[in-house]
Amino acid sequence: MFKEFKEFALKGNMIDLAIGVIIGGAFGSLVNSIVNDIFMPIIGLITGGIDFSNMFIQLAGEKQATLSAAKAAGATISYGHFITLLINFLIIAWVLFFFVKAMNKMRRKEEGESPNKTSSEEQLLTEIRDLLAKKK
């Protein structure tokens, strides 16, 4: 049983998956840093320093000054938090779009530089075509 587990755990696909998860986690941290440390301050400057995360509608109880106090007092609709998450999502999607676009461009460039190799099927079909052309 241990031998089977060892074979499973050390297969190339499992190791590739583990590496992908680790790199994905690191990439997620990098993208979050780009959003929170670069783009959100710029958006804050453009919007005049509006803090969307503290915008809410209080459904019950007395009117409160902060979201945390309003949540403690009763039901709230935290639409500002939703706006903040929506902005974060759009920025992350935008950054990832350009990253993937650049990666695809590099891939196409690399594929274009490789010599155009014909497959064995194509070679066989070419030979058959040539033989048929000679018989005519």
Curated annotation (Swiss-Prot):
Membrane topology (UniProt): Multi-pass membrane protein
A molecular function (GO) term: mechanosensitive monoatomic ion channel activity
Subcellular location per the Swiss-Prot or TrEMBL entry: Cell inner membrane
InterPro entries in the record: Mechanosensitive_channel_CS (IPR019823), MS_channel (IPR001185), MSC/AndL (IPR037673), MscL_channel (IPR036019)
Family annotation (Pfam families): MscL (PF01741)
SUPFAM superfamilies referenced in this protein's UniProt entry, alphabetically: Gated mechanosensitive channel
Keyword vocabulary terms for this entry: Cell inner membrane, Cell membrane, Ion channel, Ion transport, Membrane, Transmembrane, Transmembrane helix, Transport
Transmembrane segments: 15-35, 38-58, 80-100
One term under GO cellular component: plasma membrane
Family, similarity comment: Belongs to the MscL family.
Subunit structure: Homopentamer.
Function (record text): Channel that opens in response to stretch forces in the membrane lipid bilayer. May participate in the regulation of osmotic pressure changes within the cell.
Name recorded for this polypeptide: Large-conductance mechanosensitive channel
